[in-house]
C-alpha cells in the first residue's frame, strides 16, 4: 500500500518557458502599471536599442487604482474600492482568467491588498486571485510583482492538472495527500500548490538535483555536475559535498 505520492512536474515551468499560461490582469497602485516592464537595470543587451522584454501581462490588462502606503506601511491614500470593482469588471470583459493584486509597499502592510482581494472574491468568477504580499512578502516591487504575475499566469494550468491527478488517485483508492515538489527541493500538498503554483516552477530540475545528490552519495561521489534534459529545457546543477547549491533568485 502506498503511504505517499510525491510528484515532480514541469507543467508550471513549461507554461512560462513556452508562454502557454493564462491571460492575466493586474491591479496596481496608480502610476505603477509599467513596473513589470521597467524592472531593474538589467537589460537583454547592455548597448544599443536592441533586445526586448515582454511581461507576462499585457499593458492593456494592467490597470491602476487610487491607493498609497509609505515604506513603513502607513496609509497615505485610502484604497478606492469602487475603482477596484471597476478594474475587475474591465479585466473580466477583456478576457482575463486570473488577476494579480500588487500595491506599492504591501510587504510592510498588506491591508489594501487584502481588502482588494476580498472585493475580488465576490467579483471574480474564476477565483484565480494572486496577492503579491501572500506570494512574496519582501521589499522590491518588481520582484514581488513579477513573482505574483508568474503565479497568476500558471495557476489555471496547474490547478486543472493537479485536480485531474488527484481525482485519478482517489479513483484508484489512494487516500493520502498528494505531495508536489517545490523549486526549493521540498514538497507541499496539492491544494497548497494550486494556491501558489509559482512554488513549483523549476521543481522538476530541483527534484533531479536532489535525486542526483542522493544517488551520488550512495555511490561514493559527493561532488557532481548533474544534467537534466527534457523536451523543453536542459538544466545543469552543481553538487558539492553531496549538497545541491541553493539560490534565493531565479530568472526565466
Residue ranges and their predicted role:
Residues 1-252:
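N-terminally biased helix-coil "hinge/interface" segments that flank
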Amino acid at each position: 500500500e502506498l503511504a505517499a505520492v510525491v510528484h515532480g512536474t514541469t507543467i508550471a515551468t513549461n507554461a512560462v518557458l513556452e508562454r502557454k499560461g493564462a491571460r492575466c490582469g493586474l491591479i496596481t497602485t496608480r502610476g505603477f502599471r509599467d513596473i513589470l516592464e521597467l524592472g531593474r537595470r538589467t537589460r537583454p543587451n547592455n548597448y544599443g536599442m536592441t533586445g526586448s522584454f515582454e511581461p507576462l501581462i499585457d499593458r492593456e490588462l494592467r490597470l491602476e487604482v487610487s491607493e498609497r502606503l509609505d515604506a513603513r506601511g502607513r496609509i497615505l491614500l485610502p484604497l478606492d474600492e469602487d475603482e477596484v470593482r471597476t478594474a475587475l469588471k474591465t479585466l473580466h470583459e477583456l478576457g482575463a482568467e486570473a488577476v494579480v493584486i500588487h500595491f506599492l509597499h504591501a510587504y510592510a502592510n498588506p491591508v489594501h491588498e487584502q481588502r482588494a482581494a476580498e472585493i475580488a472574491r465576490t467579483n471574480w468568477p474564476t477565483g484565480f486571485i494572486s496577492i503579491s504580499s501572500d506570494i512574496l512578502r519582501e521589499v522590491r516591487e518588481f520582484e514581488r510583482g513579477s513573482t505574483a504575475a508568474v503565479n497568476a499566469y500558471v495557476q489555471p494550468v496547474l490547478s486543472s492538472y493537479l485536480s485531474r491527478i488527484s481525482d485519478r488517485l482517489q479513483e484508484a483508492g489512494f487516500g493520502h495527500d498528494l505531495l508536489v515538489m517545490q523549486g526549493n527541493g521540498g514538497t507541499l500538498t496539492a491544494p497548497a500548490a494550486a494556491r501558489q503554483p509559482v512554488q513549483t516552477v523549476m521543481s522538476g530540475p530541483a527534484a533531479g538535483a536532489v535525486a542526483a545528490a542522493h544517488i551520488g552519495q550512495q555511490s561514493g561521489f559527493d561532488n557532481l555536475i548533474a544534467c537534466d534534459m527534457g523536451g523543453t529545457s536542459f538544466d545543469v546543477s552543481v553538487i558539492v559535498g553531496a549538497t545541491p547549491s541553493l539560490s534565493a533568485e531565479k530568472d526565466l
